[in-house]
Amino acid sequence: MATNTPTEPGGDLALLGLMQLVSPALPIGAFAWSQGLESAFELGWVNNEAELAQWIEGVLEDGLSRCELPLLARLQTAWANDDGATIAHWNQWLHATRETAELSDEDTRLGGALKTLLGNLNLLPDQTLIPAEPGYITLFAWAAQVRRVPVRQTLLGFAWAWLENQLAVACKALPLGHTAAQRIIEQLRPALVNATDQALARQDHELGPILPGLALGSALHETQYSRLFRS
């Protein structure tokens, strides 16, 4: 059970806690996964800076804003209310949206790594509230809640970390220059805000990713001859 929760919701400690959570130095192995992006390079779907920005923005709009981000908001609220049934429901729902073995494996392994880290930091919640196979989103929501991060900031932080990871993949595998990556960040910062706004406004019946291309790329990645990343 966590014992060192900050007392000021949304204060400096919360901000620093969020920065820790979204840091690429967080030892959970997120750098090893590309979420199908490496396959998009291999298949010739994404070949340059402009196409990469278009791909990332599409995944943000049709994926994160419809799935990960709204679920993150729901899960953080459920953690705040110690609502184990709702936590279990959305954790299971999230697993069901992972359309390939690699995407499912990524979510489960990152969730397991984050659980281990939180345990080492004495930040785990009541064991009875943790699902048997907690996904990454589920425990990210808890880690933000225990730090008293406001929900909107949690979503923005998660989206930022996801964007940085996608660009890190591109810098290694496309390859993309670091200055080009910064141009994409400048271009897509408003899209992160827009995706967060959309996620917070979505009703339950509006949830679910619409990413057939990403799912196909992820499936093909399983048999890709030469790979740098695990998804």
UniProtKB/Swiss-Prot annotation:
* This protein's UniProt keywords: Chaperone, Cytoplasm, Nickel insertion
Q: Which GO terms describe its cellular component?
A: cytoplasm
Q: Where in the cell is it found?
A: Cytoplasm
The record, for Pfam families, names:
UreF
The keyword Cytoplasm is annotated on this UniProt entry: yes
InterPro entries per record: UreF, UreF_sf
Its domain of life reads Bacteria
Entry keyword annotation includes Ion transport: no
The record, for Gene3D superfamilies, names: Urease accessory protein UreF
**What would be an example GO MF term here?**
nickel cation binding
What does the sequence similarity comment in the record state about its family? Belongs to the UreF family.
Name the job this protein performs.
Answer: Required for maturation of urease via the functional incorporation of the urease nickel metallocenter.
Subunit structure, as described in the record: UreD, UreF and UreG form a complex that acts as a GTP-hydrolysis-dependent molecular chaperone, activating the urease apoprotein by helping to assemble the nickel containing metallocenter of UreC. The UreE protein probably delivers the nickel.
Which protein are we looking at?
Answer: Urease accessory protein UreF
Q: What is the scientific name of the source organism?
A: Marinobacter nauticus (strain ATCC 700491 / DSM 11845 / VT8)
The upper taxonomy is: Bacteria, Pseudomonadati, Pseudomonadota, Gammaproteobacteria, Pseudomonadales
